[in-house]
Protein backbone atom coordinates (compact mmCIF):
# COMPACT_ATOMS: atom_id res chain seq x y z
CA UNK A 1 0.00 0.00 0.00
CA UNK A 2 2.77 2.36 0.90
CA UNK A 3 4.60 1.56 -2.28
CA UNK A 4 1.46 2.01 -4.31
CA UNK A 5 0.50 5.20 -2.53
CA UNK A 6 3.90 6.77 -3.08
CA UNK A 7 3.80 6.99 -6.90
CA UNK A 8 0.17 8.04 -6.87
CA UNK A 9 0.90 10.90 -4.50
CA UNK A 10 3.85 11.97 -6.60
CA UNK A 11 1.68 11.96 -9.74
CA UNK A 12 -0.97 14.07 -8.09
CA UNK A 13 1.68 16.55 -6.92
CA UNK A 14 3.14 16.83 -10.42
CA UNK A 15 -0.30 17.37 -11.93
CA UNK A 16 -1.08 20.07 -9.40
CA UNK A 17 2.21 21.81 -10.18
CA UNK A 18 1.47 21.71 -13.92
CA UNK A 19 -1.99 23.15 -13.44
CA UNK A 20 -0.58 25.89 -11.24
CA UNK A 21 2.06 26.73 -13.86
CA UNK A 22 -0.54 26.91 -16.62
CA UNK A 23 -2.69 29.13 -14.47
CA UNK A 24 0.19 31.55 -13.80
CA UNK A 25 1.26 31.65 -17.45
CA UNK A 26 -2.31 32.16 -18.62
CA UNK A 27 -2.86 34.97 -16.13
CA UNK A 28 0.36 36.67 -17.20
CA UNK A 29 -0.57 36.31 -20.87
CA UNK A 30 -4.03 37.72 -20.26
CA UNK A 31 -2.50 40.63 -18.34
CA UNK A 32 -0.08 41.30 -21.19
CA UNK A 33 -2.87 41.07 -23.77
CA UNK A 34 -4.60 44.08 -22.24
CA UNK A 35 -2.03 46.38 -23.91
CA UNK A 36 -2.40 44.64 -27.29
CA UNK A 37 -5.26 46.23 -29.21
CA UNK A 38 -6.51 45.66 -32.73
CA UNK A 39 -6.12 48.96 -34.58
CA UNK A 40 -9.56 48.90 -36.20
CA UNK A 41 -11.20 48.46 -32.79
CA UNK A 42 -10.05 51.89 -31.62
CA UNK A 43 -13.08 54.18 -31.84
CA UNK A 44 -11.65 57.48 -30.62
CA UNK A 45 -8.43 59.10 -29.41
CA UNK A 46 -8.11 62.13 -27.13
CA UNK A 47 -4.64 63.64 -27.40
CA UNK A 48 -2.95 66.42 -25.39
CA UNK A 49 -0.15 68.79 -26.35
CA UNK A 50 1.80 68.25 -23.09
CA UNK A 51 1.68 64.44 -22.90
CA UNK A 52 3.66 61.58 -24.43
CA UNK A 53 2.59 58.21 -25.81
CA UNK A 54 3.28 54.85 -24.22
CA UNK A 55 6.04 52.73 -25.71
CA UNK A 56 7.20 49.13 -25.84
CA UNK A 57 9.66 48.69 -28.71
CA UNK A 58 10.44 52.35 -29.49
CA UNK A 59 10.87 55.66 -27.72
CA UNK A 60 7.71 57.56 -26.68
CA UNK A 61 6.66 60.51 -28.83
CA UNK A 62 4.51 63.60 -28.12
CA UNK A 63 0.80 62.94 -28.47
CA UNK A 64 0.48 66.12 -30.58
CA UNK A 65 3.23 67.16 -32.97
CA UNK A 66 3.14 69.96 -35.56
CA UNK A 67 5.15 69.17 -38.69
CA UNK A 68 4.87 72.44 -40.64
CA UNK A 69 2.30 74.07 -42.88
CA UNK A 70 1.86 77.56 -44.33
CA UNK A 71 1.24 79.09 -40.90
CA UNK A 72 4.17 77.39 -39.21
CA UNK A 73 4.27 75.58 -35.90
CA UNK A 74 4.92 78.61 -33.65
CA UNK A 75 1.82 80.56 -34.65
CA UNK A 76 -0.76 78.49 -32.75
CA UNK A 77 -0.73 75.39 -30.54
CA UNK A 78 -4.01 73.59 -29.74
CA UNK A 79 -4.20 72.13 -26.26
CA UNK A 80 -6.28 69.05 -27.04
CA UNK A 81 -7.42 67.27 -30.21
CA UNK A 82 -9.90 64.41 -30.48
CA UNK A 83 -9.72 61.97 -33.39
CA UNK A 84 -12.58 59.60 -34.29
CA UNK A 85 -12.46 56.40 -36.30
CA UNK A 86 -14.34 57.08 -39.55
CA UNK A 87 -13.79 53.75 -41.25
CA UNK A 88 -11.44 50.98 -42.30
CA UNK A 89 -9.95 50.82 -45.79
CA UNK A 90 -8.77 47.23 -45.45
CA UNK A 91 -5.36 48.13 -44.08
CA UNK A 92 -5.55 51.35 -42.04
CA UNK A 93 -8.10 53.36 -40.11
CA UNK A 94 -9.25 56.71 -41.51
CA UNK A 95 -9.56 59.47 -38.90
CA UNK A 96 -11.37 62.74 -38.45
CA UNK A 97 -9.62 64.99 -35.93
CA UNK A 98 -11.31 68.04 -34.41
CA UNK A 99 -10.31 70.89 -32.14
CA UNK A 100 -10.98 74.59 -31.56
CA UNK A 101 -8.69 76.71 -33.76
CA UNK A 102 -8.31 80.43 -34.27
CA UNK A 103 -10.30 81.61 -37.29
CA UNK A 104 -7.02 82.39 -39.06
CA UNK A 105 -5.85 78.75 -39.07
CA UNK A 106 -6.94 75.36 -40.33
CA UNK A 107 -5.59 71.84 -40.43
CA UNK A 108 -3.46 70.75 -43.36
CA UNK A 109 -2.30 67.16 -43.68
CA UNK A 110 -2.92 64.96 -40.63
CA UNK A 111 -1.84 61.41 -39.81
CA UNK A 112 -2.29 59.25 -36.70
CA UNK A 113 0.87 57.35 -35.77
CA UNK A 114 0.65 54.20 -33.60
CA UNK A 115 3.32 51.75 -32.45
CA UNK A 116 2.81 48.25 -33.83
CA UNK A 117 2.81 45.70 -31.07
CA UNK A 118 5.33 43.30 -32.62
CA UNK A 119 6.42 45.26 -35.71
CA UNK A 120 5.41 48.15 -37.93
CA UNK A 121 3.27 45.74 -40.00
CA UNK A 122 1.34 44.35 -37.03
CA UNK A 123 -2.41 44.88 -37.12
CA UNK A 124 -2.28 45.09 -33.34
CA UNK A 125 -0.91 48.22 -31.71
CA UNK A 126 0.21 49.13 -28.21
CA UNK A 127 -2.48 50.72 -26.11
CA UNK A 128 -1.83 54.43 -25.58
CA UNK A 129 0.90 54.58 -28.24
CA UNK A 130 -1.03 56.65 -30.79
CA UNK A 131 -0.20 60.28 -31.49
CA UNK A 132 -1.16 62.87 -34.11
CA UNK A 133 1.12 64.64 -36.56
CA UNK A 134 -0.52 67.64 -38.21
CA UNK A 135 0.19 70.63 -40.42
CA UNK A 136 -1.18 74.10 -39.68
CA UNK A 137 -2.24 76.29 -42.62
CA UNK A 138 -3.73 79.76 -42.99
CA UNK A 139 -7.41 80.12 -43.85
CA UNK A 140 -8.58 82.63 -46.47
CA UNK A 141 -9.39 85.04 -43.65
CA UNK A 142 -5.94 84.55 -42.19
CA UNK A 143 -4.26 85.26 -45.53
CA UNK A 144 -6.41 88.35 -46.01
CA UNK A 145 -5.48 89.73 -42.63
CA UNK A 146 -1.84 88.86 -43.24
CA UNK A 147 -1.85 90.87 -46.47
CA UNK A 148 -3.63 93.80 -44.83
CA UNK A 149 -1.06 93.93 -42.06
CA UNK A 150 1.71 94.20 -44.65
CA UNK A 151 3.54 91.08 -43.55
CA UNK A 152 3.19 89.07 -46.73
CA UNK A 153 4.89 91.46 -49.14
CA UNK A 154 7.56 94.09 -48.52
CA UNK A 155 7.80 93.48 -44.81
CA UNK A 156 9.04 89.92 -45.27
CA UNK A 157 12.09 90.97 -47.24
CA UNK A 158 12.80 93.79 -44.82
CA UNK A 159 12.41 91.56 -41.77
CA UNK A 160 14.62 88.88 -43.31
CA UNK A 161 17.29 91.48 -44.04
CA UNK A 162 16.93 92.90 -40.53
CA UNK A 163 17.21 89.43 -38.99
CA UNK A 164 20.33 88.64 -40.97
CA UNK A 165 21.86 92.02 -40.20
CA UNK A 166 21.30 91.66 -36.47
CA UNK A 167 21.89 87.93 -36.19
CA UNK A 168 24.40 86.81 -33.52
CA UNK A 169 27.02 86.22 -36.23
CA UNK A 170 26.83 89.74 -37.65
CA UNK A 171 25.47 91.79 -34.75
CA UNK A 172 28.88 93.18 -33.75
CA UNK A 173 29.92 94.20 -37.26
CA UNK A 174 26.47 95.55 -38.07
CA UNK A 175 26.43 97.69 -34.93
CA UNK A 176 29.85 99.17 -35.70
CA UNK A 177 28.90 99.96 -39.30
CA UNK A 178 25.66 101.60 -38.19
CA UNK A 179 27.44 103.79 -35.64
CA UNK A 180 30.10 104.85 -38.17
CA UNK A 181 27.46 105.78 -40.77
CA UNK A 182 25.44 107.81 -38.27
CA UNK A 183 28.54 109.66 -37.05
CA UNK A 184 29.55 110.46 -40.64
CA UNK A 185 26.09 111.84 -41.41
CA UNK A 186 26.07 113.93 -38.24
CA UNK A 187 29.52 115.34 -39.04
CA UNK A 188 28.41 116.21 -42.56
CA UNK A 189 25.38 118.10 -41.28
CA UNK A 190 27.51 119.96 -38.77
CA UNK A 191 30.13 120.81 -41.38
CA UNK A 192 27.63 122.01 -43.99
CA UNK A 193 25.24 123.98 -41.81
CA UNK A 194 26.37 124.57 -38.26
CA UNK A 195 30.12 125.05 -38.36
CA UNK A 196 31.34 128.69 -38.52
CA UNK A 197 35.04 128.03 -38.85
CA UNK A 198 37.63 130.79 -38.93
CA UNK A 199 38.34 131.51 -42.54
CA UNK A 200 41.65 132.98 -43.58
CA UNK A 201 41.50 136.65 -44.55
CA UNK A 202 41.37 137.38 -48.26
CA UNK A 203 44.68 138.08 -49.97
CA UNK A 204 45.88 141.66 -50.33
CA UNK A 205 44.01 143.48 -53.04
CA UNK A 206 43.78 147.05 -54.21
CA UNK A 207 40.02 146.83 -54.25
CA UNK A 208 38.30 148.98 -51.66
CA UNK A 209 37.42 147.13 -48.47
CA UNK A 210 33.75 147.70 -49.14
CA UNK A 211 33.75 146.79 -52.84
CA UNK A 212 31.28 144.31 -54.24
CA UNK A 213 34.00 141.64 -54.16
CA UNK A 214 33.89 141.50 -50.35
CA UNK A 215 30.47 142.93 -49.88
CA UNK A 216 29.23 139.91 -47.97
CA UNK A 217 31.95 140.43 -45.34
CA UNK A 218 31.19 144.11 -44.85
CA UNK A 219 29.71 145.53 -41.71
CA UNK A 220 26.51 146.33 -43.59
CA UNK A 221 25.63 142.64 -43.85
CA UNK A 222 23.10 141.38 -41.34
CA UNK A 223 24.22 138.92 -38.71
CA UNK A 224 23.80 135.26 -39.65
CA UNK A 225 21.16 133.15 -37.89
CA UNK A 226 22.31 131.41 -34.77
CA UNK A 227 24.44 128.39 -35.57
CA UNK A 228 24.76 128.99 -39.34
CA UNK A 229 27.79 129.98 -41.36
CA UNK A 230 28.16 133.59 -42.33
CA UNK A 231 28.42 132.79 -46.04
CA UNK A 232 24.82 131.51 -46.01
CA UNK A 233 23.54 135.00 -45.24
CA UNK A 234 23.21 137.94 -47.56
CA UNK A 235 23.79 141.69 -47.19
CA UNK A 236 21.72 143.89 -44.99
CA UNK A 237 18.17 144.04 -46.21
CA UNK A 238 18.41 140.97 -48.41
CA UNK A 239 15.89 138.19 -48.25
CA UNK A 240 16.76 135.75 -45.47
CA UNK A 241 18.73 132.77 -46.71
CA UNK A 242 19.44 134.15 -50.22
CA UNK A 243 22.06 136.87 -50.22
CA UNK A 244 24.82 137.95 -52.50
CA UNK A 245 26.83 135.00 -51.31
CA UNK A 246 24.93 132.96 -53.89
CA UNK A 247 24.54 135.57 -56.66
CA UNK A 248 27.76 137.51 -56.45
CA UNK A 249 31.39 136.48 -56.76
CA UNK A 250 32.78 134.30 -53.99
CA UNK A 251 35.09 135.91 -51.48
CA UNK A 252 37.88 133.43 -52.11
CA UNK A 253 38.40 129.99 -53.52
CA UNK A 254 38.10 128.02 -50.27
CA UNK A 255 34.69 129.20 -49.08
CA UNK A 256 33.36 125.62 -48.51
CA UNK A 257 30.41 123.69 -50.00
CA UNK A 258 27.60 125.62 -51.60
CA UNK A 259 24.03 125.94 -50.53
CA UNK A 260 22.66 123.38 -52.96
CA UNK A 261 25.12 120.71 -51.81
CA UNK A 262 24.05 121.22 -48.21
CA UNK A 263 20.40 121.32 -49.19
CA UNK A 264 20.71 118.04 -51.09
CA UNK A 265 22.51 116.35 -48.22
CA UNK A 266 19.89 117.55 -45.77
CA UNK A 267 17.11 116.27 -48.01
CA UNK A 268 18.71 112.84 -48.31
CA UNK A 269 19.25 112.71 -44.56
CA UNK A 270 15.65 113.66 -43.87
CA UNK A 271 14.41 111.06 -46.32
CA UNK A 272 16.52 108.33 -44.76
CA UNK A 273 15.38 109.09 -41.23
CA UNK A 274 11.79 109.54 -42.34
CA UNK A 275 11.65 106.29 -44.26
CA UNK A 276 13.38 104.47 -41.43
CA UNK A 277 10.76 105.71 -39.00
CA UNK A 278 7.96 104.79 -41.39
CA UNK A 279 9.28 101.34 -42.17
CA UNK A 280 10.70 99.97 -38.95
CA UNK A 281 8.47 97.08 -37.88
CA UNK A 282 9.37 97.44 -34.22
CA UNK A 283 7.81 100.85 -33.70
CA UNK A 284 4.19 101.80 -33.53
CA UNK A 285 4.63 104.05 -36.55
CA UNK A 286 4.89 100.99 -38.81
CA UNK A 287 1.16 100.55 -38.58
CA UNK A 288 -1.16 103.19 -40.06
CA UNK A 289 -2.12 106.03 -37.76
CA UNK A 290 -5.60 106.19 -39.26
CA UNK A 291 -8.23 103.59 -38.37
CA UNK A 292 -8.27 100.75 -40.93
CA UNK A 293 -11.35 100.11 -42.98
CA UNK A 294 -11.83 96.77 -41.21
CA UNK A 295 -12.38 97.38 -37.53
CA UNK A 296 -10.09 94.91 -35.83
CA UNK A 297 -6.77 94.63 -34.07
CA UNK A 298 -5.17 92.35 -36.63
CA UNK A 299 -2.72 95.14 -37.44
CA UNK A 300 -1.33 95.05 -33.93
CA UNK A 301 1.89 93.23 -33.25
CA UNK A 302 0.03 90.72 -31.08
CA UNK A 303 -0.81 88.91 -34.34
CA UNK A 304 2.54 87.42 -35.23
CA UNK A 305 3.57 84.01 -36.40
CA UNK A 306 6.29 84.10 -33.74
CA UNK A 307 3.95 84.88 -30.86
CA UNK A 308 2.10 81.63 -30.43
CA UNK A 309 1.62 79.27 -27.55
CA UNK A 310 -0.60 76.59 -26.13
CA UNK A 311 -4.14 77.50 -27.05
CA UNK A 312 -3.11 81.01 -28.03
CA UNK A 313 -5.27 82.99 -30.42
CA UNK A 314 -4.74 86.17 -32.37
CA UNK A 315 -6.85 89.21 -31.69
CA UNK A 316 -9.94 89.57 -33.85
CA UNK A 317 -12.86 91.91 -34.09
CA UNK A 318 -15.35 91.73 -31.28
CA UNK A 319 -18.09 91.08 -33.83
CA UNK A 320 -16.45 87.84 -35.02
CA UNK A 321 -15.81 84.59 -33.13
CA UNK A 322 -12.18 84.21 -32.19
CA UNK A 323 -12.22 80.42 -32.57
CA UNK A 324 -14.26 77.77 -34.32
CA UNK A 325 -14.20 73.98 -34.55
CA UNK A 326 -11.79 72.86 -37.25
CA UNK A 327 -11.49 69.35 -38.69
CA UNK A 328 -8.61 67.49 -40.29
CA UNK A 329 -8.74 64.17 -42.12
CA UNK A 330 -6.07 61.53 -42.54
CA UNK A 331 -5.01 57.93 -42.23
CA UNK A 332 -2.79 55.86 -39.94
CA UNK A 333 0.92 55.13 -39.90
CA UNK A 334 2.25 52.27 -37.80
CA UNK A 335 5.77 52.59 -36.51
UniProtKB/Swiss-Prot annotation:
- Mention one GO biological process in which this protein takes part, according to its record: calcium ion transport
- From the UniProt entry, list the residue stretches annotated as the region Disordered: 203-259, 300-335
User: What is the name of this protein?
Assistant: Store-operated calcium entry-associated regulatory factor
Its function, per the record, reads: Negative regulator of store-operated Ca(2+) entry (SOCE) involved in protecting cells from Ca(2+) overfilling. In response to cytosolic Ca(2+) elevation after endoplasmic reticulum Ca(2+) refilling, promotes a slow inactivation of STIM (STIM1 or STIM2)-dependent SOCE activity: possibly act by facilitating the deoligomerization of STIM to efficiently turn off ORAI when the endoplasmic reticulum lumen is filled with the appropriate Ca(2+) levels, and thus preventing the overload of the cell with excessive Ca(2+) ions.
Where, in residue ranges, is this chain on the Lumenal side? 31-172
Q: What is its main location?
A: endoplasmic reticulum
Assembly with partners or alone: Interacts with STIM1; the interaction is inhibited by the interaction of STIM1 with EFHB.
Family to which the UniProt record says this protein belongs? Belongs to the SARAF family.
Q: What would be one Gene Ontology cellular-component term for the protein?
A: endoplasmic reticulum membrane
Cytoplasmic compartment ranges equal: 194-335
Q: Does the keyword Transport apply?
A: yes
The record's subcellular location field reads:
Endoplasmic reticulum membrane
From start to end residue, where is composition biased (Low complexity)? 237-248
Domains: entry comment: The cytoplasmic C-terminal region mediates interaction with STIM1, while the N-terminal lumenal region mediates regulation of SOCE activity.
Secretion signal, residue range per the UniProt entry: 1-30
Give me the segments passing through the membrane. 173-193
* Topological relation to the membrane, as annotated: Single-pass type I membrane protein
Write out the entry's keywords from A to Z.
Calcium, Calcium transport, Endoplasmic reticulum, Ion transport, Membrane, Signal, Transmembrane, Transmembrane helix, Transport
Q: Name one Pfam family in it.
A: SARAF
Amino acid sequence: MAAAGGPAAAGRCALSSLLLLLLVVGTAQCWDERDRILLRDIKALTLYYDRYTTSRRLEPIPQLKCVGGTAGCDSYTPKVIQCQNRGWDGYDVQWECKTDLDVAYKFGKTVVSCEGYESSEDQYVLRGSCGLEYQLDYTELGLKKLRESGKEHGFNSFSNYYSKLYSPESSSLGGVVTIVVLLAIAFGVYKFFLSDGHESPPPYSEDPPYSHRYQRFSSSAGPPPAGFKSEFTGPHGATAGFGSAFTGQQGHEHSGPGFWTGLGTGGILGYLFGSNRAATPFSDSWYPSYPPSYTSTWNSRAYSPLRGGPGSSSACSGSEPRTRTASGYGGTRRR
